[in-house]
Amino acid sequence: MINGELIVDNFAGGGGASTGIELATGYSVDIAINHDPEAIKMHKANHPNTKHYCENVWAVDPVKACKGHPIGLAWFSPDCKHFSKAKGGKPKDKNIRGLAWVALRWAGLVRPRVIMLENVEEFKTWGPLNRRHHPIKSKQGRTFEKFVQQLTDLGYEVQFKELVAADYGAPTMRKRFFMIARCDGKPIVWPDPTHAPADSEEVKKGLLKPYVGAYTQLDFSLPCPSIFDTSEEIKEKYGIRAVRPLAQKTMDRIARGFIKFILNNPKPFIIQCN
């Protein structure tokens, strides 16, 4: 608890958001909810003092879970796959796309002082599906607008924006949608970036730190089989299993990266790993 207020993590997964919340506030989350037993096991290992619910988020009664305690922060990271462009043109699941509505349930029943929601940037396009379970382009964003309006009607000030993880020291350029809603009358304050490209003026002047490269998270002492080797060759050379051939889209993505970061890059990052 923070000053007597609970912290609740819906869609808690293995505990990534919970760990971030603890790093930011100094307090462990009080309640974590996830339907996956394996995810809950991992969450328990990392957050043993948290009350865990291995259930569908809709099955948990906010009033009973909170036992009369006020909520300082309720965090929501609903399933993103049925919004993400990474899913391509595959049919979407209306029920999964609608999981975010559980935030309104919590807002209406126990009124968290601050609500935060994280998802892919396409979350803003949330709208109705046609009979073939594909988004209706002419109605993109309609459901999202209703979602925001209902939070507003409940007395919340709502702001949202897209943030790039690298701007805050994470070794990834991943962009994510973030929403903050609060009902305590205090201003919503977004964090200022702490990092920028190494050749930016902000970094040159010492105002910001340079981006952290993904290579800092890689162990280059591990075997790195060629993308051109077969599964059998990799097993013989390294004694490990590997899927080959790679999917064509994966190969295309590797080719684009090679062209962008090696062939067309005046300062290519090259490392010998074998």
Q: For the regions a protein language model found, what residue spans apply to each?
A:
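Class I SAM-dependent methyltransferase "Motif I" SAM/SAH-binding loop
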Residues: F11-G15
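Conserved SAM/SAH-binding beta-strand->alpha-helix loop
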Residues: D36
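Conserved beta-strand elements of the Class I
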Residues: L6-D9
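S-adenosyl-L-methionine
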Residues: K41-C66
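Class I S-adenosyl-L-methionine
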Residues: V63-L73, C80-N274
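The conserved SAM/SAH-binding core of class I Rossmann-like methyltransferase domains
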Residues: I33
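A short, Lys/Arg-enriched amphipathic alpha-helix followed by its capping loop at the start of a domain
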Residues: G20-S28, N46
